[in-house]
Amino acid sequence: MATIRRLQQTLSHLRPPKAPQLLSIVEGPTQPELLDITLGELLTLQSLQYGDYECLVFPWTGARWTYTDLKDEADRVARGLLAMGIQKGDRIGIMAGNCEQYISVFFAAARVGAILVVLNNTYTPSELYYALGHTDCRLLFLTPRIGRHSLEEVLAKLGPRPKEQGTSSALEEIIILRGQYSGFSTYEHVIQRGLPLPSHALQDREAELHSTDVCNLQFTSGSTGNPKAAMLTHHNLVNNSRFIGDRMNLTSFDILCCPPPLFHCFGLVLGMLAVVTHGSKIIFPSETFDPTAVLHAISDEKCTALHGVPTMFEAILSLPKPPNFDCSNLRTGIIAGAPVPRPLMKRLLEELNMTEYTSSYGLTEASPTCFNALTTDSIERRLTTVGKVMPHAKAKIIDTQGHIVPIGQRGELCIAGYQLTKGYWNNPEKTAEALITDSDGVTWLKTGDEAIFDEEGYCSITGRFKDIIIRGGENIYPLEIEERLAAHPAIEVASVIGIPDQKYGEVVGAFLALAADVSARPSDEELRAWTRETLGRHKAPQYFFVFGEEGVDRTIPVTGSGKVRKVDLRKIAASVLERRLAKTAAIKEK
């Protein structure tokens, strides 16, 4: 026995040492260097370099502005704001569809050191009043209508001068951004007020500004409680938008078609600012999302890039192509906001020529992009991951105790770097919950998203923690079920949620949009069998709901930025199941 023990000891010394386990923490490149300029300085620099190049095109208004046009118009509006007494740090609200005046106001506010509060187009009057009150806006730029959404109730209630009329404690004046409305000042009036100002007034104000000043409040699209307003700086936005454009290989010859709204980081930063930082051109096809207008813009303007969330691309691809449609110039763009189903990706490559599309991940609090694929990444990488971490950013994945997990293990994604918000406006409690400083003095943003890194640093988002379905103690991830269901020839789109269940805690429920050419919907059992062909039995949906049936609206509920509102789907599911139960009980009584 002693001889055997000695032999075992000898062999154990001969074995190679175990390789240390790699942890899920990554850092982005340190080049190119960060720019230390304000948004106003950025626009001045780009107008000097690209002055006569077209910058903004709005087919629906007829506007075609060069870089010089944009700079000059922003200066005129900025002088008007100074004449109206706007001080550094004052909040200015804006609620409108995509239009050229929106962008001139954005840069004008930045030039005078004001903080632009971008307001969601889908806000109800009460949501708008909350946002205005929470941020104490002094001015509000508004249009009486945004698409089919009327804001006349707001105009009637607040009046032209709300503070003076006693309808608001802080809001001094409402400005009509486009067109006219009886009794209200207009965008043109703002410009006229600035005409008498001395020529040096704007330069004097700009000399007081710094790149680390807050210039933008972006409300998060939270589904519970009041939304929080993330404070973003010039430094955040200038640099994040540069790096986004770099990941798409944008040049001054590129033309981006941008359906996402300007009130969201997707349209404002990934779209407009990414273009401005690269001397490119951007096309906003319509006031609000219109898939027909997008198709015309792609073809008529010879676009090389296209942005959107998956629901937008689904809508675009569901339409017949216009006569003489040409997308041969299209190569890249960003798909973000929600996971991309494999069948949709295949169609983007085959039907829209987006061979260099990039996947992306970000959130408002990070200005927004944290990860973005390269155009040279393989199709499989771009489909299954959101690429690698952006320059000058760090990312880690932690467990519930806050420890960094090994590579290949799921956990909560956290972000650090220059792009983090300064916090939530007037909300220190929520700021402290989201921004955590570690023992090394590094501040990390807890995203609330579950993710996984591979050994090369590619990141895959595996779900929102709040969307994960826990069935009998086992985690089920909606994305893989959605992808499997969407691969069925009869299904156009699938959205999966958790349904409360007495036995298992939660079970799987699936909302389906049927393909246009389907004559009869597949049975529930057929769809379960389809799911079980590639996924475990417990992942097959117990309940199915079809848009346009059983009182469910035909339209998929989405946020203003195009993300599916799963919180609404859960409410709809509860209502439908209640009706089904009542119907079953009535039949039994007979």
UniProtKB/Swiss-Prot annotation:
Molecular-function GO terms, alphabetical: ATP binding; medium-chain fatty acid-CoA ligase activity
Keywords: ATP-binding, Ligase, Nucleotide-binding, Peroxisome
Residue sites binding ATP per the record: 220-228, 359-364, 449, 464, 563
Pathway: Siderophore biosynthesis
Effects seen without this gene: Blocks TAFC biosynthesis, decreases resistance to oxidative stress, and attenuates virulence in a murine model of invasive pulmonary aspergillosis.
GO cellular component: peroxisome
Residues bound to CoA: 472-474, 543-545
Signal peptide coordinates: none
Enzyme class: ligase
Alphabetical list of Pfam families matching this protein: AMP-binding, AMP-binding_C
GO terms, biological process: cellular response to hydrogen peroxide; cellular response to iron ion starvation; ergosterol biosynthetic process; fatty acid metabolic process; ferricrocin biosynthetic process; N',N'',N'''-triacetylfusarinine C biosynthetic process
CDD domains from the UniProt entry: FACL_like_2
S-S pairs: none
Enzyme Commission number(s) from the entry: 6.2.1.-
Subcellular location: Peroxisome
Motif (PTS2-type peroxisomal targeting signal): 6-14
Binding site for substrate: 364
General function of this protein: Acyl-CoA ligase; part of the siderophore biosynthetic pathway. Aspergillus fumigatus produces 4 types of siderophores, low-molecular-mass iron chelators, including excreted fusarinine C (FsC) and triacetylfusarinine C (TAFC) for iron uptake and intacellular ferricrocin (FC) for hyphal and hydroxyferricrocin (HFC) for conidial iron distribution and storage. TAFC consists of 3 N(2)-acetyl-N(5)-anhydromevalonyl-N(5)-hydroxyornithine residues cyclically linked by ester bonds; FC is a cyclic hexapeptide with the structure Gly-Ser-Gly-(N(5)-acetyl-N(5)-hydroxyornithine)x3.
Family from the record: Belongs to the ATP-dependent AMP-binding enzyme family.
Record's protein name: Acyl-CoA ligase sidI
Species whose genome carries this gene: Aspergillus fumigatus (strain ATCC MYA-4609 / CBS 101355 / FGSC A1100 / Af293)
